[in-house]
């Protein structure tokens, strides 16, 4: 599945869309809205198509929507583990088949298969748990970063990039294409680098993110599904950051995706997405991520491995 990124780099200022104001989030009403066909069988539509492929985050989010419809109201997802096994066809709807693997008193497991052309393109297992108190609790400390109110959004950053007289000629077309796309999430990078000065960077990035529009407090299951969508955004691109000054992306897709849900949160409120890549090699990259609430609570942990094939970066002086 495709993993969106900024033009020829891995930073999380990829795409934007016009905010719907006070309207209910388009992620809930359209992007993650499934059509029930039969018991435990659903059809998804309304696909965002970056790089002519289905966006992996949308498939993960829709699969979790399907799984959540088969469990009781008093249980919530605590983990999911997914594999992308075939490229999705953006011209066709996706069928989601849910298997009720186990329903227990505390934990329940659901297996979800996403199907096109009669073959699975994606498989997922999600585990749900009833809320339970525990005296054993700890978490890492949230990174200290500027609040989202002090940072520029991607729309403003793209305008600044396009006005930069030192911007390399290969970027304006890609930036204008990005600016024309509509994406149902808002992004504010913590430390965006100028595109005119590609340089070696640490395989780490942070950005504030939230769903556009209003989701509300009532449905925690939907907030988890929206977070699943958000979690794949520019995630794998973190592995590119140390290499973007000498290589450009030839091919990049997600192989798998895992998430662990720790605490309640609202996906329509700002959360800090902390991403890092501890390893890359063998035409693969590994990335880890943490979604933090603004009050410092660790809400979600993510991990992903993907295929990354690159070509040498050709300087404009050699063109």
Curated annotation (Swiss-Prot):
Residues 1-20 are annotated as: Disordered. One of its GO terms (molecular function) is acyl-CoA hydrolase activity. It comes from Homo sapiens. It catalyses: choloyl-CoA + H2O = cholate + CoA + H(+); chenodeoxycholoyl-CoA + H2O = chenodeoxycholate + CoA + H(+); acetyl-CoA + H2O = acetate + CoA + H(+); butanoyl-CoA + H2O = butanoate + CoA + H(+). It comes from the Eukaryota. It is an enzyme of class 3 (hydrolase). This is Acyl-coenzyme A thioesterase 8. Keywords: Fatty acid metabolism, Host-virus interaction, Hydrolase, Lipid metabolism, Peroxisome, Peroxisome biogenesis, Serine esterase. GO terms for cellular component: cytosol; peroxisomal matrix. Catalyzes the hydrolysis of acyl-CoAs into free fatty acids and coenzyme A (CoASH), regulating their respective intracellular levels. Displays no strong substrate specificity with respect to the carboxylic acid moiety of Acyl-CoAs. Hydrolyzes medium length (C2 to C20) straight-chain, saturated and unsaturated acyl-CoAS but is inactive towards substrates with longer aliphatic chains. Moreover, it catalyzes the hydrolysis of CoA esters of bile acids, such as choloyl-CoA and chenodeoxycholoyl-CoA and competes with bile acid CoA:amino acid N-acyltransferase (BAAT). (Microbial infection) May mediate Nef-induced down-regulation of CD4 cell-surface expression. Inhibited by CoASH (IC(50)=10-15 uM). Also inhibited by cysteine-reactive agents. The active site is at residues 232, 254, 304.
């Amino acid at each position: 599945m495709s993993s969106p990124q900024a033009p020829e780099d891995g930073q999380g200022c990829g795409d934007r869309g016009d905010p719907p104001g006070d309207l209910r989030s388009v992620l809930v009403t359209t992007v993650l809205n499934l059509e029930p066909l039969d018991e435990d069988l659903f059809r998804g539509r309304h696909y965002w198509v970056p790089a002519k492929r289905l966006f992996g985050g949308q498939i993960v989010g829709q699969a979790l929507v399907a799984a959540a419809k088969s469990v009781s109201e008093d249980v919530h997802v605590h983990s999911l583990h997914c594999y992308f096994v075939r490229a999705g066809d953006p011209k066709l709807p996706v069928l989601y088949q849910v298997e009720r693997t186990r329903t227990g008193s505390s934990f329940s497991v659901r297996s979800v298969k996403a199907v096109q052309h009669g073959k699975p393109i994606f498989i997922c297992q999600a585990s749900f748990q009833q809320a339970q108190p525990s005296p054993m609790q700890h978490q890492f400390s949230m990174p200290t970063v500027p609040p989202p109110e002090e940072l520029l959004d991607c729309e403003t950053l793209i305008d600044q990039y396009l006005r930069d007289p030192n911007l390399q000629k290969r970027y304006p077309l890609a930036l204008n294409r990005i600016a024309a796309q509509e994406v149902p999430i808002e992004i504010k990078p913590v430390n965006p680098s100028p595109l005119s000065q590609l340089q070696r960077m640490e395989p780490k990035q942070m950005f504030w993110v939230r769903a556009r529009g209003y989701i509300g407090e009532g449905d925690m299951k939907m907030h988890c599904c929206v977070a699943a969508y958000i979690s794949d955004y520019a995630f794998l691109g973190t592995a590119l950051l140390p290499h973007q000054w000498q290589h450009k992306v030839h091919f990049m897709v997600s192989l798998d995706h895992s998430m662990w849900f720790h605490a309640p949160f609202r996906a329509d409120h700002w959360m800090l997405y902390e991403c890092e890549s501890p390893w890359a090699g063998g035409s693969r990259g590994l990335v880890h991520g943490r979604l933090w609430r603004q009050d410092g609570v660790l809400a979600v942990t993510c991990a992903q491995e993907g295929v990354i094939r690159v070509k040498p970066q050709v300087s404009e002086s050699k063109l």
